[in-house]
């Protein structure tokens, strides 16, 4: 039945409902780690500093094999539920680290996931704020960060929404309200059912109407992040910098079902103040395999000051940073965990160091690592070629093109080492960013970003150029 709806419609069992509430509040009792599943393995992706997993000596890259008496190899349920419970509850686990069996006892404690995990004064007057989710605490934490930074001397702000997947709509509106007057329309929702049509306006007096503001977005900024970026862009209140956002502009509502379960269904779409639709996928247009296609239209709209902006799925930045886009090869290396696993190996090779900077020698080792391990690197070109062959088979012409297909596929695969070399700097950067979290946790990662990322440097450059801000935000 769910397949007849859009891909974002999902059934929540009782545990999923609890997890959804945790995402909205940012609070739970657990081990304090990000957990992922890959090829049947339960992997610790990131350890949160000073929480239970960290205190028990667990590290990113550890593979959990058993929780109490439950062996996880064939465990199909959500493993995170086994790692939650009452405060101070003790859990015995077994795990693999670099191929060796180990054990640990974890004493659960309360985990507080910050909506604003990091903020910093850059130089003498630029405030930098990372906003990673839109939970019930987002506006409160953002406001506190702004006031703290202003007390330190900040007269300009960077709001970093990169890779923020969204969250509560009301919090997105309230974040905008920090910078725009009361009664401004931030977002409207439109549905085929009239009662689901809504207009969301700012309701409070603003915190600061004048402070120069830049907003950072990327292709993983979605939903509530896009409402903030699109709303402040349409109101000419902030310069949006980075790369085009994800394009998730669907309003979803949880509907209660029996036995504590829910189904989250799509009821309407988001529209920015200028009238732009954020949604990228058009479910009325599907390809041969039944997948929804990205909208191709680029309709023109006007901001409050009369600037031209466009819809077509996602928010386009005022200032694009093409060099910040991840290459197809880098995406493939992230997807197959090559970057993550090599970083784990490199960390243990240099575990006694307080920090580590990836060298050219390490990059050569990475190339050898790719050669010696069975990593499937499926680039965009290879995916398109595979799609072509699927169509050829459907049309019964595959036998006529198979030889050329095999030649092209072999050429793409044989070109991997050359592509690695071409993307050397990007790959080294990704390994560095993964490594820094092993040594310095998330705080160290954010500090590293401030010092090294071109996106943040571009924001500072724009903020230090009032004439450029005026020109960008004017008709």
Which residue stretches match the model-derived regions?
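Cleft-lining beta-strand/loop regions that shape enzyme active-site pockets
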Residues: 43-46, 54-59, 65-71, 76-258
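Extended, small/polar residue-biased N-terminal targeting/export presequences
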Residues: 1-43, 88-116, 450-460, 468-475
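Sec-exported extracytoplasmic/periplasmic mature domains
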Residues: 2-10, 66-69, 84, 88, ...
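Conserved functional hotspot residues or short segments at active or partner-binding sites
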Residues: 277-284, 288-475
């Amino acid at each position: 039945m769910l397949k007849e709806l859009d891909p974002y419609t999902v059934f929540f069992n009782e545990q999923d409902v609890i997890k959804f509430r945790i995402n909205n509040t940012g609070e739970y009792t657990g081990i304090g780690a990000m957990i992922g599943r890959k090829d049947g393995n339960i992997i610790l992706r990131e350890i949160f500093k000073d929480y239970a997993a960290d205190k028990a000596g667990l590290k990113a890259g550890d593979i959990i094999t058993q929780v109490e008496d439950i062996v996880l190899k064939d465990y199909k349920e959500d493993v995170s539920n086994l790692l939650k419970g009452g405060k101070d509850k003790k859990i015995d686990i077994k795990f693999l680290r670099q191929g060796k069996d180990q054990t640990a006892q974890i004493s659960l404690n309360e985990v507080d996931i910050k909506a604003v995990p990091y903020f910093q004064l850059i130089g003498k007057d630029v405030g930098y704020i990372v906003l990673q989710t839109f939970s019930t605490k987002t506006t409160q934490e953002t406001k506190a960060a702004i006031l703290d930074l202003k007390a330190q001397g900040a007269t300009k702000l960077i709001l970093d929404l990169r890779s923020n997947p969204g969250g509560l709509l009301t919090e997105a509106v309230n974040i905008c309200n920090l910078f725009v007057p009361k009664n401004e329309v931030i977002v409207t929702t439109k549905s085929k059912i009239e009662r689901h049509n809504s207009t969301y306006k700012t309701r409070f007096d603003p915190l600061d109407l004048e402070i120069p503001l830049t907003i950072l977005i990327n292709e993983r900024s979605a939903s509530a992040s896009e409402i903030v970026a699109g709303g402040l862009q349409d109101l000419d209140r902030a310069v949006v910098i980075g790369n085009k956002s994800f394009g998730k502009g669907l309003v979803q509502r949880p509907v209660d079902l029996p036995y504590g379960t829910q189904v989250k269904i799509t009821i309407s779409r988001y529209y920015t103040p200028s009238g732009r639709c954020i949604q990228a996928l058009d479910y009325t247009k599907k390809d041969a395999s039944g997948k929804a296609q990205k909208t191709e239209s680029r309709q023109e709209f006007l901001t409050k000051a009369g600037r031209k902006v466009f819809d077509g799925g996602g928010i386009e930045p005022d200032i694009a940073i093409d060099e910040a886009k991840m290459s197809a090869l880098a995406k493939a290396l992230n997807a197959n965990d090559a970057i993550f696993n090599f970083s784990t190996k490199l960390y243990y090779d240099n575990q006694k160091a307080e920090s580590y900077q990836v060298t050219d020698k390490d990059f050569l080792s990475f190339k050898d690592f790719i050669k010696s391990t069975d990593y499937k690197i499926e680039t965009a070109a290879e995916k398109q070629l595979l799609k072509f062959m699927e169509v050829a088979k459907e049309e019964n012409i595959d036998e006529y093109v198979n030889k050329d297909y095999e030649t092209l596929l072999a050429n793409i695969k044989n070109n991997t080492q050359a592509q690695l070399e071409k993307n050397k700097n990007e790959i080294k950067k990704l390994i560095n960013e993964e490594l820094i979290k092993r040594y310095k946790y998330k705080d160290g990662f954010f500090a590293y970003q401030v010092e090294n990322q071109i996106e943040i440097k571009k924001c500072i450059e724009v903020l230090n150029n009032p004439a450029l801000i005026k020109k960008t935000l004017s008709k």
